[in-house]
Amino acid sequence: MADWNAEQYLKFEDERTRPARDLLAQVPTTAPRKVADIGCGPGNSTALLVERWPEASVIGVDTSADMLRQARERLPQHKFIEANVAHWAPPAGTDVLFANAVFQWVPDHLKQLRRLLSGLDSGGVLAVQMPDNLDEPSHIMMREVALQEPWRHQLSKAAELRDTLPKPSVYYDALKPLCSRLEIWHTVYNHALDGPEAIVEWVKGTGLRPFIDPLELPERKTYLAAYTARIAAAYPAQADGQVLLRFPRIFIVAVK
């Protein structure tokens, strides 16, 4: 995919940050020395970590140059690293590994979660949140439109960039032997948005990118028009004209 677009991502900053707040609220650590924000994006989640633990050394890690530019502007006093989590190791003595909406994009992410959890000292925390929405209409419609002409050839591999998440029982069996405490839960958010076009704008910043990035501008416009029409049918307006975007997410908090 092309580089992430921080401006597009931040169009729904409040809604995207809420799961990070909910995840952070369940992290039991009171006074960590070192904290790492994996997949820090534009720094919205990193800011929460800095706010909660102002005395800690907080670093952010991301693969996107544009996201890191925004994060550095937001938090110039903190360190941000461009790195792929699959090849990155946290600094020795890191107490909290925080990952908001990143591991769904990481191939074989369960292996990576085990690796990171194994490297923590006793009492260290791995806190993870991932969208679990591939079976929602917002994402089903992406794949359905991509199978149609004239996009079928260019987008045949788009859906392969993100796998369906394992069941909670799979995460439990993989992670529990490595930690003293493990909490796993789902939360379903219902975001009130201004209409089907707002849903499209939301997913253009994340899940829709593998489907539109490969397309030239004319093909992208026709794809988005077809996709928007399906979204309008799948998400009817409420009494006040808003639409509700149902958004399930899985949360994992593991204490070493």
UniProtKB/Swiss-Prot annotation:
Keyword S-adenosyl-L-methionine belongs to the record: yes
What Gene3D superfamilies does the entry give? Answer: S-adenosyl-L-methionine-dependent methyltransferases, Vaccinia Virus protein VP39
Where would you find this protein in the cell?
Cytoplasm
Species of the source: Rhodopseudomonas palustris (strain TIE-1)
What is the role of this chain?
Catalyzes the S-adenosylmethionine monomethyl esterification of trans-aconitate.
Give one GO molecular function term.
Answer: trans-aconitate 2-methyltransferase activity
Protein name as it appears in the record: Trans-aconitate 2-methyltransferase
Q: What is the lineage of its organism?
A: Bacteria, Pseudomonadati, Pseudomonadota, Alphaproteobacteria, Hyphomicrobiales
Alphabetical UniProt keywords: Cytoplasm, Methyltransferase, S-adenosyl-L-methionine, Transferase
Q: Which NCBIfam families match?
A: PRK01683.1
Q: What class of enzyme is it?
A: transferase
| A Pfam family of this chain | Methyltransf_25
Concerning SUPFAM superfamilies, the annotation shows: S-adenosyl-L-methionine-dependent methyltransferases
| Cellular component, GO, one term | cytoplasm
Q: Which family does it belong to?
A: Belongs to the methyltransferase superfamily. Tam family.
Task: Give the enzyme's EC designation.
Answer: 2.1.1.144
Q: Which GO terms describe its biological process?
A: methylation
What reactions does this protein catalyze? trans-aconitate + S-adenosyl-L-methionine = (E)-3-(methoxycarbonyl)pent-2-enedioate + S-adenosyl-L-homocysteine
Q: Which CDD domains match?
A: AdoMet_MTases
